[in-house]
Amino acid sequence: MIRSELIQKIADENPHLYQRDVERIVNTVFEEVTDAMARGDRVELRGFGAFSVKKRDARIGRNPRTGDTVHVEEKHVPFFKTGKLLRDRLNGKA
């Protein structure tokens, strides 16, 4: 599912809301999650999961084509951990 499909589904299930309002709400949610993660905060959506940022330390890597060693800088990557309710539903337990 892509963002526009999510917006359309929410708008279809809530006919009292205009699609442009639903789009603003969805975009605001994504912006807030992104901003919180950019600050290094953890975003927890109970039952669904938690978004956080993990630090990957600098390391010595290898160029697979040439075999040369290369220095890979430290970086921060997004991480998602599923919540129990989502995990259970995906495994047919709910």
UniProtKB/Swiss-Prot annotation:
PROSITE patterns: HISTONE_LIKE. The keyword rRNA-binding does not apply. CDD domains: IHF_B. One of its GO terms (molecular function) is structural constituent of chromatin. InterPro entries: Hist_DNA-bd, Histone-like_DNA-bd_CS, IHF-like_DNA-bd_dom_sf, IHF_beta. Disulfide bonds: none annotated. One of its GO terms (cellular component) is chromosome. Keywords: DNA recombination, DNA-binding, Transcription, Transcription regulation, Translation regulation. One of its GO terms (biological process) is regulation of translation. This protein is one of the two subunits of integration host factor, a specific DNA-binding protein that functions in genetic recombination as well as in transcriptional and translational control. Heterodimer of an alpha and a beta chain. HAMAP family: IHF_beta. Belongs to the bacterial histone-like protein family. This is Integration host factor subunit beta. It comes from Ruegeria pomeroyi (strain ATCC 700808 / DSM 15171 / DSS-3).
